[in-house]
Curated annotation (Swiss-Prot):
Presence of the UniProt keyword Membrane in the record: yes
Keyword Endoplasmic reticulum on entry: yes
Organism: Danio rerio (Zebrafish)
Induction statement: By retinoic acid.
Cofactor(s) recorded in Swiss-Prot or TrEMBL: heme
GO molecular function, one term: monooxygenase activity
EC id: 1.14.13.-
Binding site for heme: C438
Name of the protein: Cytochrome P450 26A1
Main location: endoplasmic reticulum
Gene name in the database record: cyp26a1
InterPro entries to which the protein is assigned, alphabetical: Cyt_P450 (IPR001128), Cyt_P450_CS (IPR017972), Cyt_P450_E_grp-I (IPR002401), Cyt_P450_sf (IPR036396)
Length: 492
């Protein structure tokens, strides 16, 4: 009797719950698969749907690149999963991505996860559609015109030089990633939002911490309860909005008083455009647009600038080639060391630009983009059902691109060939593509070129830990924060 009781207890406490759990998982997957379009003969992509309701969101959040690499190796360039509360198809490879990026408004439409839309705002450029997207994009593009970029250069150069001097004065190693986030945050606050340097010093620490909290919880389960990721993200967002609102009101007041400015920052241009528009931005829309600019203008550039320090620290011959290119422009009379840079000079630094392109190829700061299927369509023999999310992967597309020989190696020279760049339109997509291509890509290129010129002209550096392990969340970064020792460089 005792043995029988023990067996029953074992079955009830261990075996039965396991069987019920497995049955629930199977029923969940069957429920998801039943949502296919019966009018389409093509099968769903291979893959798994994970746990009921949660899907595979937790594995993605906890494992990121390891999880995505395992999925790609197992299922190939198109597979189904369940992420952030929605059935999802992940897509990679130039031909597949081309169909998604060029299918905007016909096959797919942009749709970021609910948590992203809630925190950043549903009316931001990345979340609106049609005419509204076209008008907002046109307004924001004014802030990234060639003339605007020319006016931004002195501010960028000043902030970069100041940061480099601080790094050189430190006896110990510099944690590059946190320092880079501070630097890019200051640049974005001044150029994109028009904060004064004194104001940045006062609010910087609180704003950086709030922004970190917001970014950390940007991709979370859409559950707004105390202490949830979404709750913490919204609380941080509200603090950022309060500081931005103060600045917006000050700008409107200065504009009414016709106070002269040295240059017009991106937010000022948005305010002016709104006043002339038939559909002016509300204060809330202004705050959301400014927050989006701040995210796009500093989080991604901080990631790429950190990767630049890493790759050049591991490939010192590239540093020397950048220096030689700059010296060539000095000898041609186009540049005097220590003086101001210009758009004309930056355009001429072809190899320096290739170093940035190669960095973006291996470590694109943003791993991919989100879309939703507007109707059921076929992609490479598989059915993509209407209403399912589609994630196109930038990093995986770069990884599987055959147009890049020796793709594991850091070789900026590969981009010196114009033919390669022309022939790799959808094999190389660090800024996305189609009508949703990053509006600030030219600003990012200018900023990163200035950073690279100043860094190589003033510094030598050694990575304390060698090649770091990289993690994504939501942009790519080194898990050890890239401790680096900087020393002064003196040209012979």
């Amino acid at each position: 009797m005792g043995l029988y009781t023990l067996m029953v207890t074992f079955l009830c406490t261990i075996v039965l719950p396991v069987l019920l759990f497995l049955a629930a998982v199977k029923l969940w997957e069957m429920l998801m698969i039943r949502r296919v379009d019966p009018n389409c003969r093509s099968p769903l992509p291979p893959g798994t749907m994970g746990l009921p309701f949660i899907g595979e969101t937790l594995q993605l959040i906890l494992q990121r690149r390891k999880f995505l690499r395992m999925k790609r190796q197992k299922y190939g360039c198109i597979y189904k999963t369940h992420l952030f509360g929605n059935p999802t198809v992940r897509v990679m490879g130039a031909d597949n991505v081309r169909q998604i990026l060029l299918g905007e408004h016909k096959l797919v439409s942009v749709q970021w996860p609910a948590s992203v839309r809630t925190i950043l705002g549903s009316d931001t450029l990345s979340n609106v559609h049609g005419v509204q997207h076209k008008n907002k994009k046109k307004a924001i593009m004014r802030a990234f015109s060639r003339d605007a970029l020319e006016h931004y250069i002195p501010v960028i150069q000043q902030e970069v030089k100041s940061a480099i001097q601080e790094w050189l004065q430190k006896d110990s190693c510099v944690l590059v990633y946190p320092e880079m986030k501070k630097l890019m945050f200051r640049i974005a606050m001044r150029i994109l939002l028009g904060f004064e340097p004194e104001q940045i010093k006062t609010d910087e620490q609180e704003l950086v911490e709030a922004f970190e909290e917001m970014i950390k919880n940007l991709f979370s389960l859409p559950i707004d309860v105390p202490f949830s990721g979404l709750y913490r993200g919204l609380r941080a967002r509200n603090f950022i909005h309060s500081k931005i609102e103060e600045n917006i009101r000050k700008k409107i007041q200065d504009d009414d008083n016709e106070n002269e400015q040295k240059y017009k920052d991106a937010l000022q241009l948005l305010i002016e455009n709104s006043r002339r528009s038939d559909e002016p931005f509300s204060l809330q829309a202004m705050k959301e647009a400014a927050t989006e600019l701040l995210f796009g203008g500093h989080e991604t550039t901080a990631s790429t600038a950190t990767s630049l320090v890493m790759f050049l620290g591991l490939n010192t011959e590239v540093v020397q080639k950048v220096r030689e290119e700059v010296q060539e422009k000095v000898e041609m009379g186009m540049y005097t060391p220590g003086k101001g840079l210009s758009m004309e000079l930056l355009d001429q630094l072809k190899y320096t630009g290739c170093v940035i392109k190669e960095t973006l190829r291996i470590n694109p700061p943003v791993p991919g983009g989100f879309r939703v299927a507007l109707k059921t369509f076929e992609l490479n023999g598989y059915q993509i059902p209407k209403g399912w999310n589609v994630i196109y992967s930038i990093c995986d597309t770069h990884d599987v691109a055959d147009v890049f020989p020796n793709k594991e190696e850091f070789q900026p020279e590969r981009f010196m060939s114009k033919g390669l760049e022309d022939g790799s339109r959808f094999n190389y997509i660090p800024f996305g593509g189609g009508s949703r291509m990053c509006v600030g890509k030219e600003f990012a290129k200018v900023l990163l070129k200035i950073f690279l010129v100043e860094l190589t002209q003033h510094c030598n550096w050694i990575l304390s830990n060698g090649p770091p392990t990289m993690k994504t969340g939501p942009t790519i970064y080194p898990v050890d924060n890239l401790p680096t020792k900087f020393t002064s460089y003196v040209r012979n």
